[in-house]
Amino acid sequence: MSRARGALCRACLALAAALAALLLLPLPLPRAPAPARTPAPAPRAPPSRPAAPSLRPDDVFIAVKTTRKNHGPRLRLLLRTWISRARQQTFIFTDGDDPELELQGGDRVINTNCSAVRTRQALCCKMSVEYDKFIESGRKWFCHVDDDNYVNARSLLHLLSSFSPSQDVYLGRPSLDHPIEATERVQGGRTVTTVKFWFATGGAGFCLSRGLALKMSPWASLGSFMSTAEQVRLPDDCTVGYIVEGLLGARLLHSPLFHSHLENLQRLPPDTLLQQVTLSHGGPENPHNVVNVAGGFSLHQDPTRFKSIHCLLYPDTDWCPRQKQGAPTSR
């Protein structure tokens, strides 16, 4: 009996020890709820760039190259047509005094005192003066045209607005389908090297940004242009291309919107004429090379077709025929 009690007591003690051990074990803590996921912040849009300042007409310097003998037949037409709508932009560079022209153009008629003979030296002399006057003006764009060009000032402004004047921009139309070569010479005539480059023909017009024009200064300013042209024996428009491409490594941007008398102007689609930047005509030597446009003037009344183009662009001009103006169509 005593043995049975002893065994029972031992069993009770063992059970009590086991219960005590269980009570001493750490109880598991309740798991904290997972934090709710917050959506990642949406990426910030880049700050909007301020709109580029719009180009104003007086940001552009249009240089018209002419000669004394053309003041009557050619310049009178330009003054009556496109220059009348772009007076603040246009500067006329000639080679002789003309009180009547100066009365119309004021200080925007510049006598270059260059020779009136059409030689390489005379052409480069005028371009040199054009360049210096542009730099002096502080304007953003330089555009050169001849006195047989019609300039659509609105199309020109629209085209230039696509570019920054601080970048290297040389816009125009080459008259050749390949680059030309120039042989660089040093004093004494020793050949140095041959350079290939494109150039925009002056007869169609071309434009330079101020940023690029300033880089041209060592070879173009204060008479240096004439020295550079003489070094490579090239005329004015070719020398511009030589400086830009051959010396500075910039590139001509070919534009189909510039036109000279060297191309077949009758092939221009009539419905695109009012979008072109410059137009031209064949002159007395090639009177049939004109744009194909209908208007209130016959070919006899308007042999260059400049008046017809002008009245389509500016039908409010007081001398334009008082009729309904439509899109350009073939004659």
Swiss-Prot record:
Substrate binds at residues 74, 147. Pfam families: Fringe. GO terms for molecular function: metal ion binding; O-fucosylpeptide 3-beta-N-acetylglucosaminyltransferase activity. Has some activity with cobalt but not with magnesium, calcium and zinc. One of its GO terms (biological process) is pattern specification process. Residues 30-331 are lumenal. Its EC number is 2.4.1.222. It is found in: Golgi apparatus membrane. The active site is at residue 237. Belongs to the glycosyltransferase 31 family. Residues 1-6 are cytoplasmic. The gene is RFNG. Keywords: Developmental protein, Differentiation, Disulfide bond, Glycoprotein, Glycosyltransferase, Golgi apparatus, Manganese, Membrane, Metal-binding, Neurogenesis, Signal-anchor, Transferase, Transmembrane, Transmembrane helix. Its cofactor is Mn(2+). This is Beta-1,3-N-acetylglucosaminyltransferase radical fringe. It is an enzyme of class 2 (transferase).
